[in-house]
Amino acid sequence: MSFLEQIIERAKSDVKTIVLPESTDLRVIKAASMIMKKGIAKVVLIGNEKEIKSLAGDIDLEGVMIEDSLNSEKLEDYANTLYELRKSKGMTIEAARETIKDPLYYGVMMVKKGEADGMVAGAVNSTANTLRPALQILKTAPGTKLVSSFFVMVVPNCEYGHNGTFVYADCGLVENPDADQLSEIAISASKSFEMLVGAKPQVAMLSYSSYGSAKSELTEKVIKATQLAKEKAPHLAIDGELQVDAAIVPEVAKSKAKGSSVAGKANVLIFPDLDAGNIAYKLTQRLAKAEAYGPITQGLARPVNDLSRGCSAEDIVGVAAITAVQAQYVKA
């Protein structure tokens, strides 16, 4: 069973409700139908029911819930909640009433209120517009200071990682993390790996240096981040700074990182900045013909995930399944 097939089966075992707010896009409507038919999640589309059904045509939307963010009886309650959350930032109640009509804000508020368990958007909207409501309304998860992202990389015919499966972070969100932020990314990514892959995380803090083979401000940041992560999560298997070959290849680890409990068997790879992470995941995807699932958001109080604007309906189904599994781990 592939990684995604396993995720879909897990989603079906404890069905959650996922909001798809971009109902003016046919890919989203197709995905909503597929998610319902496969029993992956309950689905809420946000928009005008007549317009959605007209666009859907012959697509079966039986069981899909539709909420109209422009004419909902919940608008005043949602607006009041948004106002209370944002008044310290200068938001007025009038502005809150207008803002909450935006399907992205309305969808996130459904998640905030417990009327849905997660949201998936980005087929039409930018990453910034997709995640802004989540950051403003949901905030970070308990014990987490930073929202970041990761990819699950499944490399065919690969003896490294967990049977060729890795988590790469951060490849999509935090541009130039400082040492403290890098430690937060590492801890969150380890939890994400355990949650989605179901194996023990072995975290490598990557650099162009292994154990002081080179010294610079760049390597010092990774060393400090490793120390901070160990202090914050003493039971976490984490080491650094490590070059990527020392991190994943046992023979190289023996010479470059003697005594390391992680080197040679890392399955969670933490990159020093967004440049390195983004380049690495795309190289792995293209040259190694790996499956890349992401960017998946981590660190939010409840899951909200972003899509590529070039996504297919099938891609949306996959991200919805991952979001549903993330929602299974949210503590009430």
UniProtKB/Swiss-Prot annotation:
Enzyme Commission number: 2.3.1.8
Catalytic activity as recorded in UniProt: acetyl-CoA + phosphate = acetyl phosphate + CoA
Known pathway: Metabolic intermediate biosynthesis; acetyl-CoA biosynthesis; acetyl-CoA from acetate: step 2/2
Record localization: Cytoplasm
Family matches, as InterPro entries: P_Ac_Bu_trans (IPR012147), P_AcTrfase (IPR004614), P_AcTrfase_dom1 (IPR042113), P_AcTrfase_dom2 (IPR042112), Phos_Acetyltrans/Butyryltrans (IPR050500), PTA_PTB (IPR002505)
Gene Ontology terms: cellular component: cytoplasm
Alphabetic keyword roster: Acyltransferase, Cytoplasm, Transferase
Signal peptide region: none
Family: Belongs to the phosphate acetyltransferase and butyryltransferase family.
Alphabetized PANTHER family for the sequence: PHOSPHATE ACETYLTRANSFERASE (PTHR43356:SF3)
Descriptive protein name: Phosphate acetyltransferase
Organism taxonomic ancestry: Bacteria, Bacillati, Bacillota, Clostridia, Eubacteriales
